[in-house]
């Protein structure tokens, strides 16, 4: 039925529209041009909007798929010339979409906040301030790791580190290390964050590489880090991530080599 409606709309409007099934990666590929600092080209925004309109609603079934489509529409809307792209404006737009969508379960607070997590606007101080203040006034926001991103955007680096550390999301480890080194001047906190790589869920290769580069450049040999603790950390990184070598040696070999070279120094 969704494809029939799209075909009828295309015929009435004289525009060729081809319905496509929902694909999260395809949605992102078609809207990522709107996720930039500054103003996207009008043609880019138009193409993104038209792609979202072409997605067959009958293939958007699961709650996460519905959230992904709303998130995508919020992103495109925020890049559209002449609209109210303030946090209040985006919230009103998203709330209207949510009201017209049937969910199996209500959104959690972190899921809702994710609709407005336009990280490329973290240097827009008014947007950052409004979004941050909304989160601080909303119970449950402390479970949204990117509260730390918006705290950092406002110069609240201690809070940003604490939010990240409490949530322990893998993608925030490098942020914690950088905040601790560049803004808090606290190698101990940087090391505590780095050690999260060896506890719980594994990090991706790029995440491990970024963290290990900073460990090598700024923590190895630092008097604030006891040698025995650093050696233990390096051993654990070697043990945990060597397991990934056989399946993807090209990606992991340089990373594991660096870890082992650092271990040899001890």
Please report, for each region that a protein language model flagged, where it lies by residue:
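Sec-dependent N-terminal signal peptides
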Residues: 4-13
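Sec/Tat signal peptide C-region and signal peptidase I cleavage site
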Residues: 15-19
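Alpha-helical repeat scaffolds
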Residues: 47-55, 84-101, 126-136, 158-167, ...
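Generic helix N-cap/helix-start motif at coil->alpha-helix transitions
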Residues: 20-31, 62-75, 104-114, 127, ...
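Terminal, low-structured helical/coil segments at or just beyond the last alpha-helical repeat
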Residues: 229-266
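Alpha-helical segment of the N-proximal tetratricopeptide repeat
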Residues: 26-43
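Residue at a conserved register position within TPR or TPR-like alpha-solenoid repeats
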Residues: 34, 78-80, 119, 151, ...
């Amino acid at each position: 039925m969704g494809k029939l409606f799209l075909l009828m709309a295309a015929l009435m409007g004289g525009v060729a529209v081809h319905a496509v099934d929902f694909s999260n990666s395809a949605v992102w590929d078609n809207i990522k041009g709107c996720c930039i600092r500054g103003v996207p080209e009008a043609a880019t925004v138009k193409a993104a909007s038209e792609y979202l309109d072409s997605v067959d609603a009958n293939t958007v079934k699961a709650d996460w798929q519905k959230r992904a489509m709303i998130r995508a529409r919020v992103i495109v809307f925020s890049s559209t010339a002449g609209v109210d792209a303030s946090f209040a404006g985006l919230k009103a737009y998203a709330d209207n979409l949510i009201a017209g969508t049937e969910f199996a379960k209500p959104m959690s607070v972190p899921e809702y906040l994710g609709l407005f997590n336009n990280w490329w606007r973290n240097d827009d101080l008014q947007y950052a301030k409004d979004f941050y203040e909304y989160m601080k006034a909303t119970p449950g926001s402390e479970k949204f790791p990117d509260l730390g991103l918006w705290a950092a955007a406002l110069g609240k680096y201690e809070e940003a580190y604490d939010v990240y550390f409490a949530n322990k999301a893998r993608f925030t480890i490098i942020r914690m290390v950088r905040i601790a080194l560049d803004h808090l001047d606290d190698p101990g906190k940087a090391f505590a964050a780095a050690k999260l790589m060896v506890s719980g869920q594994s990090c991706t290769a790029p995440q491990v590489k970024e963290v290990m580069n900073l460990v090598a450049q700024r923590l190895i040999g630092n008097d604030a880090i006891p040698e025995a603790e650093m050696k233990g950390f390096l051993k654990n990184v070697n043990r945990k991530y060597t397991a990934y070598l056989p399946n993807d040696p090209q990606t992991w070999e340089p990373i594991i080599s660096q870890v082992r070279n650092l271990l040899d120094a001890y």
